[in-house]
């Protein structure tokens, strides 16, 4: 995490100019965190179906480039009216996995290049991946990766859970005097 900006810099990805307009469906804590973490050059439209929650979003979303819309993010007419065809990214972050999957499919069909679906029902992850709806996030899998990282008590830089393959991949930082330095992987 402390080298993320450095890596972005040397990779030429300090910013993501290809993503400037983002639609977020759902007004839960994940949506709030995402909207508040966006850089200034990104504009977000958060669509929330619950009126009271939409009002609350106006208080907790501090990003001045975020607009709160009270409506149904599955309503294609609303999406068209709000300019979905000009969006480069669509994040479906409701508490309903099925809704998120279908919304991302609709966004893809409307021309959005990058879609993210929060899929909390682990039974749907494989199906969602096969539909090619974009990136799939699962809080349980994400949390499990971090718990696993803490349990190992090693100098691990990254742990990823591959839900479809039922596997974990860990990236370790190896000290310069370790026995495995300068050896072939096969050894």
Which stretches of residues belong to each language-model region?
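Cytosolic regulatory regions of ion transport systems
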Residues: 1-187
């Amino acid at each position: 995490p402390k080298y993320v900006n450095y890596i972005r810099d040397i990779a030429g990805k300090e910013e993501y100019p290809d993503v400037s307009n983002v639609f977020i469906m759902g007004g839960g804590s994940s949506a709030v965190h995402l909207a508040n973490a966006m850089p200034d050059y990104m504009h977000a439209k958060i669509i929330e179906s619950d009126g009271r929650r939409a009002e609350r979003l106006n208080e907790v979303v501090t990003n001045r480039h975020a607009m709160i819309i009270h409506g149904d993010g599955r309503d294609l007419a609303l999406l068209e009216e709000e300019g979905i065809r000009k969006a480069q990214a669509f994040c479906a972050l409701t508490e309903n996995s099925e809704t998120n999957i279908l919304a991302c499919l609709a966004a893809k069909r409307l021309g959005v290049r990058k879609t993210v679906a929060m899929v909390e029902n682990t039974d749907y992850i494989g199906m969602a991946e096969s539909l090619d709806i974009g990136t799939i996030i699962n809080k349980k899998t994400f949390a499990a990766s971090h718990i696993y990282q803490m349990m190992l008590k090693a100098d691990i830089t990254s742990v990823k859970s591959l839900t479809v393959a039922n596997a974990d991949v860990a990236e370790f930082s190896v000290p310069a005097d370790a026995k495995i330095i300068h050896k072939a992987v096969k050894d």
